[in-house]
Amino acid sequence: MQQFEHPHIIRLIGVCSESPIWIVMELARLGEMRAYLQSNASRLDLATLLLFSFQLSTALSYLESKKFVHRDIAARNVLVSTPHVVKLADFGLSRVLDNQSYYKSSKGKLPIKWMAPESINFRRFTTASDVWMFGNFIFFKTNLY
């Protein structure tokens, strides 16, 4: 994650590896998107929601260019920096694709609510499954509007 430089991906500043381990990241003052949407629904217009969607789509395009799959695109993992800027965060499930077209997860809990059918059924993750999750994110976000 430290290698990512994109205006809509939260920046990793550093890691303190001595116990307790600390991850130092860029501050997104307005918190996670889910809570922000719920508390500001009456003040948000469609243009702002579309702007948020566009910003997140550029972050996903950037990740695809780096051969990464995020695997957890959800409102809880999008942070609001300012009233007009969102950033993708929480790369705990993300994986590099290397020379393969997909990543196969062998074990562990996954966020089924947002996942693509092939990810649920076969535990296969591609950039297309990230796009599916992005679509679910847009659906969630616009239903609050």
Where are these regions (language model features)?
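Intracellular eukaryotic protein kinase-like catalytic domain
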Residues: 1-145
